[in-house]
């Protein structure tokens, strides 16, 4: 049965919450369960989801971003335990989900919330104040999804090591206490692909073993319907089975949930990343990254009406060759007996006739980490951009020096280096927040994130190009008004430096944090939307943030390379092909004429050419 085959899954499970672990999403900014708390650590690791990450990670919530449908969004992250290096078996699963603000019930509406407390059934409809409809408590998965999970029998064919786990799907090796993390289903979180219905839609699977790609793609709910046991009303207190036969015997109805019908996800080979480092890929020294082509209104109807609330999730799954999780050597609950190192804490093993102790916890043979974005919107394209190819350019990072910001990162543009074709478009947009720790290093009002963009000659320059140096041939932004908007972020009510000094009694420290000091962007909002700009000239353009680029301390620069539609070698190849075509056509014409005019001068000329004589 196809249902049973879907239970043969990878082990991507379990880690204690005390482990520093981890995957952190940097673009778009990953929350790691933060909201707008100002402490160094997040307030609540159970606010929306079970990340299993360090409490210090994550970016606080700024104003929500919105991107155009079918535009390209750079998804960047760092993962601590490596991938693609042969030292772990790993995959990274990128997923999203959206709800329609105009149609979703309170129990389904995706939102960030304004507090850090975990939602409960009594909190779903609460707003922050009587004056606003903004929800007080954050929520990603719906209450209905959570109810289905807590009322569903867990898959008892799974390896659980030496743990005694309850009967329901809200308990796994990795989370065995029944705590709720928002309305996330812990079993669905820990396993992929999952056998029960899920609201998450697959974007991509990035794996060290591409032999599994066909299976991943075919089992995705993007293309594969899922089933669950809809219980009779008299059976609500009994966990509903995941087996159709037992479901029927319980008086339930084996119920189909259609696929998302959006096409199978992409499955690609993981790039090499170092174990024990939140570092970069080997090939180009940048963070691991996936260019996500955002869904269109045919996939998410709320895009057409401008009423989408969406969230992005990236999960990082690692396991070991010591414990197989798929294929003929699939390890299931039968390995939970007393024998074997995979079921013993810190086992002693014999090496050269003597015991040595391994530093092993069997619960850590398979581990899942996770991060999620704050809520964002996907919007319809205007008529002028219907056929345009649009690349999104963001800012990642948070206030602080390299030590203070870690495991988040210092400010940087994303992508740092962008290659596009002439006449393609860039959507410049980024956000930050005002709730970083007050003592973190940075310019301007304490705790605040701000970034601007000014053109520089090369990446080795730290002074912006002057108006005299910019012209129609070399300017990233052709007109002065656009350059000013990207440099000053549209600030109003600004004071000159002399006015600021007078206002603050010549106290330079007070001038730096004065709200009317627009030179350090103090009067700008947390979000900047520079709009969509057409790149109509080829060339290379370099830029920096004047507020955050602090030479020898931190670097916030970027490069845009606008390439011709065809590379030089392609143009040469086409030219050569055209020349060859002309020569062949001319030769064929001469041969044809000579064949039908045997007494002509053309016939005599062609007959003297080796290889052509026999043709006439």
From Swiss-Prot:
Disulfide links within the chain: none
Membrane topology (Extracellular): 22-563
Source species, domain of life: Eukaryota
Location, primary (coarse class): membrane
Residues in the Cytoplasmic compartment per record: 585-616
UniProt keyword Cell wall biogenesis/degradation, yes or no: no
Protein task: May participate in O-glycosylation.
Protein name per its UniProtKB record: Protein DD3-3
Species lineage: Eukaryota, Amoebozoa, Evosea, Eumycetozoa, Dictyostelia
């Amino acid at each position: 049965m196809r249902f049973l085959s879907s239970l043969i899954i990878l082990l991507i499970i379990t880690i204690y919450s005390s482990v520093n672990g981890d995957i952190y999403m940097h673009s778009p900014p990953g929350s790691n369960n933060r909201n707008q708390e100002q402490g160094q650590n997040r307030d609540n690791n159970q606010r929306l989801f079970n990340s299993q990450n360090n409490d210090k990670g994550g970016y606080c919530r700024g104003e929500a971003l919105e991107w155009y449908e079918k535009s390209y969004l750079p998804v960047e992250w760092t993962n601590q335990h490596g991938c693609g290096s042969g030292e772990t078996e790993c995959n990274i699963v990128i997923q999203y989900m959206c709800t329609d603000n105009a149609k979703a019930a309170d129990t389904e509406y995706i939102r960030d919330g304004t507090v850090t407390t975990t939602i409960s059934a009594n909190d779903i409809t609460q707003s922050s104040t009587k004056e606003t409809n903004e929800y007080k408590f954050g929520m990603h998965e719906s209450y209905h999804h959570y109810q289905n999970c807590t009322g569903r029998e867990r898959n008892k064919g799974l390896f659980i090591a030496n743990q005694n786990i309850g009967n329901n799907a809200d308990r796994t090796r990795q989370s065995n206490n029944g705590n709720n993390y928002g309305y996330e289903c812990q079993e669905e979180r820990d396993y992929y692909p999952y056998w029960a219905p899920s609201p998450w839609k697959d974007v991509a699977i990035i794996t060290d073993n591409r032999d599994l790609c066909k299976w991943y793609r075919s089992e995705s709910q993007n293309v594969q319907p899922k089933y669950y046991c809809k219980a009779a009303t008299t059976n609500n207190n009994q966990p509903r089975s995941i087996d159709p036969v037992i479901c029927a015997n319980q008086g339930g109805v084996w119920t189909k949930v259609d696929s998302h019908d959006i096409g199978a996800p992409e499955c690609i080979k993981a790039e090499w990343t170092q174990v024990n480092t939140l570092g970069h890929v080997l090939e180009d020294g940048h963070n691991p990254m996936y260019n996500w082509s955002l869904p269109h209104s045919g996939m998410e109807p709320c895009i057409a009406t401008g009423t989408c609330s969406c969230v992005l999730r990236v999960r990082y799954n690692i396991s070991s060759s010591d414990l197989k999780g798929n294929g003929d050597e699939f390890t299931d609950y039968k390995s939970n007996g007393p024998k074997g190192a995979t079921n013993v804490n810190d086992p002693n093993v014999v090496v050269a006739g003597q015991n040595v102790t391994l530093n092993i916890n069997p619960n850590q043979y398979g581990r899942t980490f996770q991060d999620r974005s704050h809520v964002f919107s996907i919007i319809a394209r205007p008529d002028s951009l219907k056929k345009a190819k649009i690349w999104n350019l963001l800012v990642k990072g948070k206030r602080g020096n390299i030590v203070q910001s870690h495991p988040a990162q210092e400010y940087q543009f994303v992508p740092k280096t962008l290659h596009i074709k002439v006449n393609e478009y860039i959507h410049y947009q980024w956000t930050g927040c005002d709730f970083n720790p007050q003592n973190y290093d940075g310019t301007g009002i304490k705790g605040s994130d701000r970034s601007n963009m000014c053109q520089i000659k090369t990446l080795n320059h730290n002074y912006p190009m002057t108006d005299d140096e910019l012209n129609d041939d070399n300017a990233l932004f052709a007109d002065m008004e656009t350059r000013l908007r990207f440099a000053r972020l549209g600030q109003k009510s600004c004071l000159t430096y002399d006015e600021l000094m007078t206002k603050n009694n010549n106290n330079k420290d007070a001038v730096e944090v004065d709200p009317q000091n627009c030179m350090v962007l103090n009067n700008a909002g947390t979000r900047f939307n520079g709009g969509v700009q057409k790149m109509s000239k080829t060339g290379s353009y370099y830029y920096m943030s004047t507020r955050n680029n602090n030479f020898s301390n931190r670097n916030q620069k970027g490069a845009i390379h606008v390439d011709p539609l065809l590379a030089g070698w392609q143009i040469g190849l086409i030219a050569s092909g055209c020349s060859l075509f002309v020569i062949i056509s001319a030769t064929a014409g001469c041969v044809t004429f000579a064949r039908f005019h045997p007494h002509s001068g053309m016939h005599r000329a062609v007959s003297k050419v080796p290889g052509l004589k026999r043709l006439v």
